[in-house]
UniProtKB/Swiss-Prot annotation:
One of its GO terms (biological process) is S-adenosylmethionine biosynthetic process. Its cofactor is Mn(2+); Mg(2+); Co(2+); K(+). It comes from Petunia hybrida. Its EC number is 2.5.1.6. Belongs to the AdoMet synthase family. The lineage of its organism: Eukaryota, Viridiplantae, Streptophyta, Embryophyta, Tracheophyta. Binds 2 divalent ions per subunit. The metal ions interact primarily with the substrate. Can utilize magnesium, manganese or cobalt (in vitro). Binds 1 potassium ion per subunit. The potassium ion interacts primarily with the substrate. It is found in: Cytoplasm. InterPro entries: ADOMET_SYNTHASE_CS, S-AdoMet_synt_C, S-AdoMet_synt_central, S-AdoMet_synt_N, S-AdoMet_synthetase, S-AdoMet_synthetase_sfam. This is S-adenosylmethionine synthase 1. It comes from the Eukaryota. GO terms for molecular function: ATP binding; metal ion binding; methionine adenosyltransferase activity.
Length: 390
């Protein structure tokens, strides 16, 4: 039997790039909560003792950017300089301007256009992917890497492992078999966890706790065998972390945000962008389309691409590939997708309820993946049943 290895990684919410994603989306939430028509393109960067937010925001909302930055960092666990950042005493820099009027008139005609006429905020192409290898219809390597990262945070915050600090990374390698285009996971080849820790804990304690409290609850025992390799803090020491260890920037973790290297990616990041930015809304609706194809039993694996021109409402192209796993021809699946999904930006915002912010709606997406999440706020995970015409 011919097999292959595939690897996906994740980082948890204390990673500096992910801190930036969460700050950008917390600001988006605050703007949309008060003004659903807000136009937001918010970037964040961070390094030792400093967080800066910058970009273009046009909104009627009253937003305290500095408070959002500090609250977000504090919520992650950055409460003192020795863990990587002190939320209450770090420098917060804000350099935010209004959206360019050239972009504004081309995209939304200064809010005079009907929803179906609103043009895409930029050019670009986005991909959605789904696979039947997990209940979430997501790649297993990505699901486990992501869940290991989330579990690391959980056992840090509930004090199961009090020696943990906020920053951390995970990586999972799985041995697969290709079943005529469908992916069949066989076993875990390697699990890698690198987590920030305090000065007191030993490497033996780290390895023991990670196996017992992080890996065991996430990865089913039947996928682990005597040949599974564990690299648990292989560098030996990871005390300095967060923005103190590495600079962070919004939009640096786009594969972790999506499918862990499976499928494809058009290159556009998500966080800090309102729904007129098709980098985000376009990627969300093609995930819904691909997931619906697989959930409806039309294919075991599916990728969907959509592309846009700035200021133009209708997509330039829609593409589908089922990797030869389709129960009907791909061209018929494409017809079904076009009949059931409206790819115009204004309509995506309405149909997926993307103008609703606040209550951590977008901030939640900014750590542990935008897809495969069981949460009603992740409206793009709702399956539409697709019935081919007899």
């Amino acid at each position: 039997m011919e097999t292959f290895l595939f690897t996906s990684e994740s980082v948890n919410e204390g990673h500096p790039d992910k801190l930036c994603d969460q700050v950008s989306d917390a600001i988006l939430d605050a703007c949309l909560e008060q003004d659903p028509e807000s136009k937001v393109a918010c970037e964040t960067c961070t390094k030792t003792n400093m967080v800066m937010v910058f970009g273009e925001i046009t909104t009627k909302a009253t937003v305290d950017y500095e408070k959002i930055v500090r609250d977000t960092c504090r919520g992650i666990g950055f409460t003192s300089a020795d863990v990587g950042l002190d939320a209450d005493h770090c420098k917060v820099l804000v350099n935010i301007e209004q959206q360019s009027p050239d972009i504004a008139q081309g995209v939304h005609g200064h809010l005079t256009k009907k929803p179906e006429e609103i043009g895409a905020g930029d050019q670009g192409h986005m991909f959605g992917y789904a696979t039947d290898e997990t209940p979430e219809l997501m790649p297993l390597t990505h699901v486990w890497a992501t869940k290991l990262g989330a579990k690391l945070t959980e056992v840090r915050k509930n004090k199961t492992c009090p020696w943990l600090r906020p920053d951390g990374k995970t990586q999972v390698t799985v041995e697969y078999r290709n079943d005529n285009g469908a992916m069949i996971p066989l076993r875990v080849h390697t699990i890698l966890i690198s987590t920030q820790h305090d000065e007191t804990v030993t490497n033996d304690q780290i390895a023991q706790d990670l196996k017992e409290h992080v890996i065991k609850p996430v990865v089913p025992a039947e996928y682990l065998d005597e040949n599974t390799i564990f690299h648990l803090n292989p560098s030996g020491r990871f005390v300095i972390g967060g923005p103190h260890g590495d600079a962070g920037l919004t939009g640096r973790k786009i594969i972790i945000d999506t499918y862990g290297g499976w499928g494809a990616h058009g290159g556009g990041a998500f966080s800090g962008k309102d729904p007129t930015k098709v980098d985000r809304s376009g990627a969300y609706i093609v995930r819904q389309a691909a997931k619906s194809v697989v959930a409806s039993g039309l294919a075991r694996r599916c990728i969907v691409q959509v592309s846009y021109a700035i200021g133009v409402a209708e997509p330039l192209s829609v593409f589908v590939d089922t990797y030869k796993t389709g129960t009907i021809p791909d061209k018929d699946i494409l017809t079904l997708i076009k009949e059931n999904f409206d790819f115009r930006p204004g309509m995506m915002s309405i149909n997926l309820d993307l103008l609703r912010g606040g209550n951590f709606r977008y901030q939640k997406t900014a750590a542990y993946g935008h897809f495969g999440r069981d949460d009603p706020d992740f409206t793009w995970e709702t399956v539409k049943v697709l019935n081919p015409q007899a």
